[in-house]
Amino acid sequence: MSMQDPIADMLTRIRNGQAANKVAISMPSSKLKVAIANVLAEEGYIANVKVSEGVKPELEITLKYFQGKPVVESIQRVSRPGLRIYKRKNELPKVMGGLGVAVVSTSKGIMTDRKARQAGLGGEIICYVA
């Protein structure tokens, strides 16, 4: 059976991996998952992103902890296959008053809400991370 929402699965694996104090998690890779993971790594929510080569590439994410607690307090899917959420540049949300980030899919690629605002771009809100 095929997976309905691979992005929600990725976010759930990150959430569950940190709840279980795992060092790293792995999952099937895709360009979108790698782009989202790279944004999370740039923002400091995960430690490392690695993609294995092969017939079925695997995405390995090294999770990050601070003083024994997970860096990611909450990660939630916003736009989903059954209900896509799009926002204009001036409607992009500020997660936790600017302390968290919204991952946005724009015409210029996957980026944070801050970068999208600076570039003057709107797009699909993929998830909120705090």
Swiss-Prot record:
Family statement drawn from the similarity comment of this UniProt entry: Belongs to the universal ribosomal protein uS8 family.
Oligomer status and interactors: Part of the 30S ribosomal subunit. Contacts proteins S5 and S12.
Pfam families: Ribosomal_S8
Protein name: Small ribosomal subunit protein uS8
Ribosomal protein as UniProt keyword: yes
NCBIfam families linked: PRK00136.1
InterPro entries found in the cross-reference section: Ribosomal_uS8 (IPR000630), Ribosomal_uS8_CS (IPR047863), Ribosomal_uS8_sf (IPR035987)
Any GO molecular function: structural constituent of ribosome
Domain of life assignment: Bacteria
HAMAP family found in the cross-reference section: Ribosomal_uS8_B
UniProtKB keywords: Ribonucleoprotein, Ribosomal protein, RNA-binding, rRNA-binding
Functional summary from the UniProt entry: One of the primary rRNA binding proteins, it binds directly to 16S rRNA central domain where it helps coordinate assembly of the platform of the 30S subunit.
Species, as recorded: Histophilus somni (strain 2336)
Biological processes, Gene Ontology terms: translation
GO CC terms of this entry: ribonucleoprotein complex; ribosome
